[in-house]
């Protein structure tokens, strides 16, 4: 039947998981790592990355909200006068992977929601800026993998 919805593709962070609660602590931790615990430099890095210092929130199109670990490493390494972008990228990827799984805060009972949607015959997918491995690990940790037809990280 034309016009029938057959599938739903969800964005992970900010839709299924509380973006701020999940990622603000991770972003601050890598800023501390990069800045060597220099409070002024940490604040500068967070501002460069897209955090509003007045609200503590991240601009939706900022590197911290929508960029890759590589983009963030390039930005912050340049601001710190560092030349270890490749090493920072590896560190950020590993940190985000661990933190994203451990600290993700679902906005509702996601397995129940996804189960109801599957019961209606819908195909379900997730899209995220996370790495593919981190996306899969988060879906597995929250019991969503059996419900998903597609995960794109």
Regions found by a protein language model. Give the residues of each.
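N-terminal helical cap/lid subdomain that shapes the substrate entry/recognition surface
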Residues: 4-120
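Substrate-recognition "cap/lid" segment bordering the active-site pocket of phosphatases
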Residues: 103-105, 112, 125-153
């Amino acid at each position: 039947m034309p016009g029938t919805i057959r599938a739903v593709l969800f964005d992970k962070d900010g839709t299924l998981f509380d973006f701020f609660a999940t990622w603000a602590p991770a972003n601050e931790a890598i800023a501390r790592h990069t800045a060597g615990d220099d409070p002024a430099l940490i604040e500068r890095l967070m501002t460069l990355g897209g955090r509003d210092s007045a609200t503590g929130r991240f601009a939706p199109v900022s590197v911290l909200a929508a960029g890759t670990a590589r983009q963030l490493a390039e930005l912050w390494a340049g601001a710190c006068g560092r030349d270890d972008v490749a090493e920072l990228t590896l560190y950020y990827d590993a940190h985000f992977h661990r933190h994203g799984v451990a600290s993700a805060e679902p906005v509702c009972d996601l397995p129940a929601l996804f189960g109801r949607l599957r019961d209606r015959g819908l195909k379900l997918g997730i899209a995220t800026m996370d790495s593919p491995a981190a996306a899969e690990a988060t879906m597995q940790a929250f019991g969503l993998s059996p419900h998903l037809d597609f995960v794109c990280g």
